[in-house]
């Protein structure tokens, strides 16, 4: 996206779709929609814009009112950006186990960050955010139930995909899910306008809630009333809370999803690194997981198939996580040898 804009929020969306050249099997064509090109580096910038602007239009959000949300980080970062641009104080409630980069980014944007114990899981952070909202008269974004979440993807992400592939094949669309906004919003349009496109989602292999088949118990307002019995802690940050969000439930109930592919954390880490080192695409853990699922589809797809996947964020907010566990900060033995192979500016090697 290029040009002049009245504020940073106007730059959300219109992200590039990039061909995969080195990692794609030879019999198919693979594309990736790189959501790191959003202003704060993730697909959740769309959600943040959509929810806040819908609440402004409905009158539910008043000028200067504090916004609060339970988030694994990317939604919080997006909301911190949108709220800063529009003049709303923002409070994020986040489980203590998510990366410290997320906390610092939100605080740098002026947000307050409340941490909840890991034992309380995602349900605990949601309950805490709801409690604080009710006690203080704050607006809660409710990303897991808010229809504006999927609506913004139907209005933006899906239309961008349709425009990019107008008159061309698009055999498979692959996306992970956190809230379900991307998969549901895009699927609405694909089912209506490209019904032959197969829609594939993916989830952690140790927390395969959709694959499990058991229903999510819900409160009267559609929010989850408890943790799903198939959930277990996993390392793919931003994916699959301990419940099936209402926004994702639409994709289940309406039969949008053709296949669910479980992916392990180890495969996710390795695939994210492969995207960086083979394609130059720097992205996070859930991107590695999504692309691993897309590769699974590609390997089984008929000759000539065209596969599009979403890569939801950037890798920089994972520096403190296991994604970077094998990446050295100091020079390796090979690098020391290279440095010493010519005489100029040789660093003294520690003893």
What label would you give each PLM region?
Residues 1-351:
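PLP-dependent amino-acid enzyme catalytic core
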């Amino acid at each position: 996206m290029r040009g002049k804009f009245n504020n940073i929020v106007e730059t959300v969306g219109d992200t590039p779709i990039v061909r995969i050249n080195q990692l794609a099997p030879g019999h198919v064509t693979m594309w990736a929609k790189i959501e790191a090109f959003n202003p704060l580096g993730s697909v959740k910038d769309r959600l943040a814009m959509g929810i806040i602007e819908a609440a402004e239009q409905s009158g539910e959000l008043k000028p200067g009112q504090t916004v609060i949300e339970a988030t694994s980080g990317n939604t919080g970062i997006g909301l911190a950006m949108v709220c800063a641009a529009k003049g709303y104080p923002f409070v994020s409630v986040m489980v203590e186990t998510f990366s410290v980069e997320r906390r610092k980014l939100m605080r740098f944007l002026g947000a307050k960050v409340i941490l909840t114990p890991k034992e309380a899981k995602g349900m605990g952070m949601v309950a805490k955010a709801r409690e604080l909202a009710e006690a203080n008269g704050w607006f809660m974004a409710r990303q897991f139930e808010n229809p504006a979440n999927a609506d913004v993807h139907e209005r933006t992400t899906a239309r961008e995909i349709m425009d990019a592939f107008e008159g061309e094949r698009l055999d498979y669309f692959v996306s992970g899910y956190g809230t379900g906004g991307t998969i549901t919003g895009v699927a609405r349009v694909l089912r209506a306008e490209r019904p032959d496109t197969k829609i594939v989602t993916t989830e952690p292999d140790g927390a395969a809630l959709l694959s499990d088949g058991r229903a999510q118990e819900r409160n009267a307002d559609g929010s989850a009333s408890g943790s799903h019995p198939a959930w277990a802690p996993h390392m793919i940050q931003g994916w699959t809370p301990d419940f099936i969000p209402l926004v994702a439930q639409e994709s289940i109930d309406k039969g949008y999803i053709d296949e669910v592919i479980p992916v392990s954390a180890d495969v996710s880490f390795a695939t994210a690194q492969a995207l960086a080192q083979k394609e130059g695409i720097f992205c996070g853990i859930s991107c590695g997981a999504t692309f691993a699922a897309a590769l699974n589809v590609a390997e089984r797809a008929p000759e000539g198939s065209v596969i599009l996947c979403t890569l939801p964020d950037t890798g920089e907010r994972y520096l403190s996580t296991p994604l970077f566990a094998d990446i050295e900060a100091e020079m390796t033995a090979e690098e020391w040898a290279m440095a010493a192979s010519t005489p100029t500016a040789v660093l003294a090697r520690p003893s």
